[in-house]
């Protein structure tokens, strides 16, 4: 066992880690449960993505020992179900949140992208999301979510149309309903 010191979401941690323990395993042990393992540590699903020293990484593919002295951000750094950040709310409003497994990593990556790019292109959005295996929706809703987040950051609210309704007479199916579990 080795002791490391790192900062996670602005909190300092002094942690005992085993030699081959993954960064993801350590983060979950510390209570950061948004860091998922949907690919048995293979590195293709991307649900284990964290921001490590201001760069996206797969936490299952890193050893916890590599985090000594590092600054790490997880999806918990963005907001709570009662106080979402602009990207999280925009993802809900755009109808993109269909998988609670992918959503934390996608929201974290889009938040990180908007911190680095004032007006990201579709190619930049594609690039930042390319590490997440997304099967539940296409990218169009993610583009809308980024546009909505930018609009809210600049104007404080949306004037653009959010997730479309498919038929006015439907109560739930085919009609967007904003809901954040938690």
Where are the model-predicted features located?
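Signature of N-terminal electron-transfer/Fe-S-associated modules in redox systems
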Residues: 1-182
């Amino acid at each position: 066992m080795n002791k490391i010191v790192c900062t996670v979401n602005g909190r300092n941690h002094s942690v005992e880690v085993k030699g081959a323990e993954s960064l993801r395993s350590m983060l979950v042990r510390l209570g950061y449960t948004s860091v998922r393992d949907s690919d048995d540590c293979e590195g293709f699903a991307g649900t284990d993505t964290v921001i490590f020293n201001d760069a996206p990484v797969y936490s299952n593919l890193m050893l916890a020992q590599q985090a000594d002295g590092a600054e790490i951000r997880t999806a918990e750094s963005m907001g709570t179900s009662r106080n979402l950040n602009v990207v999280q709310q925009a993802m809900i409003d755009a109808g993109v949140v269909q998988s609670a497994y992918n959503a934390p990593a996608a929201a974290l990556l889009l938040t990180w992208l908007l911190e680095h790019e004032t007006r990201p292109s579709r190619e930049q959005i594609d690039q930042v999301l390319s590490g997440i295996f997304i099967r539940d929706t296409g990218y169009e809703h993610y583009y809308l979510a980024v546009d909505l987040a930018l609009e809210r950051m600049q104007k404080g609210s949306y004037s653009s149309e959010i997730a479309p309704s498919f038929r006015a007479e439907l109560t739930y199916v085919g009609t967007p309903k904003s809901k954040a579990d938690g």
